[in-house]
Amino acid sequence: CAAIISDTLMFRSPTCTLSDKMAAGALALIAGINIEQFAKEMFKAGSNLKDKSPEEIFYQDYKKFIAEDEINFGVGQISSMDSDELAEIKERLVPFMVSECGRHGVTRVFFMLTNIIEESTELLYYGEGSEEMARIAFHMEPKDGVFDLKGVVSRKKQLIPALMEAAQAGQNDYN
């Protein structure tokens, strides 16, 4: 049940299927738990990052990608139900992202601060061409150095396809 709740962000991710909901419901009955309450406790415990370094937070859920054979970028993600916690993480991550860009072969870094309850993501970015890539991907301007992506919670189904398409569309504009 916990794995399904985690993978589907408590059934809010576009990756969630009817089978996920049915299986989680059946498992919750067997375990004798309330899914909503269990999910809140699980996400709260999983996102307790106060004692972690910016590096540990950044690489906790981080993946590298290559677009158009030459644009190397990395995307990390943290999901939380607590807006204050996400704001605190943001303050700690921005300076780290600056130092991390260029390491491990990536020239652009992105970080998703995903609010499960609001079903939205604040997308942090750093590196030459990263702002333009996100601007093309999401057809919007950043505000205070952040893209506020309403309805975007999935790196796999929403963020990466949009960034890949933007890389293809705007390759000559920001290489």
Give names to the regions the model predicted:
Residues 21-175:
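C-terminal accessory domains and tails appended to enzymatic cores
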Residues 1-23, 135, 157:
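Short alpha-helices
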